[in-house]
Amino acid sequence: MSATAVPKAKRIPQWKIEEVEYLTTLFKSYPVFAIADLTGFPTNQLQKLRKKLSKKVLFRVSKNKLILRALRNAGIDTSKFEELLTGQNLLLFTHMNAFELSLLLDKYKAKTYYKPGEIAQQEIVIPEGNTGLSPGPILSTFSKLKIPTRIQGNSIVITRDTVVAKPGDTISEELASLLQRLDIALKEVKINIKAAYDHGIIILRDQLVLDLEEYKNMVMNAHLDALKIGSEIAWPVPEILELSLNKAFRQALALAAEAGYVTPDTAEYVFRAAIMKALALAAEVSKYAPDLGLEVPTIQPTTPPEKKEEEEKKEEEEEEAETVSEEELAEGLGALFG
């Protein structure tokens, strides 16, 4: 009677076990992490970026299955991450909030070569000058792309700047090869975050994109609205009281001028108001009694000096509101998830 064969359990490589343990520790240690797409990002540029941001962000490239296992081990729901973990990914661990991290990465872009079939992001110009390339089969590529050349010594010289592609054009094999031979790297790439995890909340890429101008305008308008309301109710804080007192002073002057209440401070405005009323009356009388020959001069009304001061104050407040930095906006939005 033969014994039933028992299949041997597949042995998991030690490096995978250690990697999962390390990632699990990172997921538990950092309140914020992001999963980013590494597709097309040059390795040498990634190393430079890793070094530049080493004090703020920890970079880690790992296998997608190992990332998922580590997430589960750390007690994090993987349902939304499973569909995102395709292709080559980069893990970013930080103590900044997710919005700060996104803004930080947006500042760093790298240049790489275009590949055949890709779409030109900008106008591509082959510059005039010595290419350093020896004459040979490549001359047919220059000819096909309508780039004027001449031979000087043992080098190909481009005789004038030539536009070989415009934004939206598809890059041909010949052009991609020539750009690489000429060391013209024009394609702009950056690390794109797929999703971020901030203190238990998953934030997808679209939600991390900030319209900074819109937020600045919102902050500025909210600040100005607060000043208006505060000055209306005379909220007892130094910044508001100054506006409220200016407003009350102007209203008091207007009331005194209307009531004819004369003091050293109001005399000018009382008399001016009286003169304006008299002139208005004279103008009206002259319509019905032109024989009187009344000549009514035009006098420009005087604005109390306090109004100018208030306008200057408002301009200062607007300038202060406009100085809100990207980091402050990111911190404020990040606080919603803290």
Swiss-Prot record:
Biased composition (Acidic residues): 312-330
Classification via Pfam families: Ribosomal_L10, RL10P_insert
A GO CC term attached to the entry: cytosolic large ribosomal subunit
GO annotation, biological process: cytoplasmic translation; ribosomal large subunit assembly
Ranges where the record places region Disordered: 295-338
Top-rank lineage group of the source organism: Archaea
Keyword RNA-binding in record: yes
Database matches in InterPro entries: Ribosomal_protein_uL10, Ribosomal_uL10, Ribosomal_uL10-like_insert, Ribosomal_uL10-like_insert_sf, Ribosomal_uL10-like_sf, Ribosomal_uL10_arc
Keywords, alphabetical: Ribonucleoprotein, Ribosomal protein, RNA-binding, rRNA-binding
Function per UniProt: Forms part of the ribosomal stalk, playing a central role in the interaction of the ribosome with GTP-bound translation factors.
HAMAP family named in the record: Ribosomal_uL10_arch
Record-stated family: Belongs to the universal ribosomal protein uL10 family.
Subunit-level organization: Part of the 50S ribosomal subunit. Forms part of the ribosomal stalk which helps the ribosome interact with GTP-bound translation factors. Forms a heptameric L10(L12)2(L12)2(L12)2 complex, where L10 forms an elongated spine to which the L12 dimers bind in a sequential fashion.
Protein name: Large ribosomal subunit protein uL10
Gene: rpl10
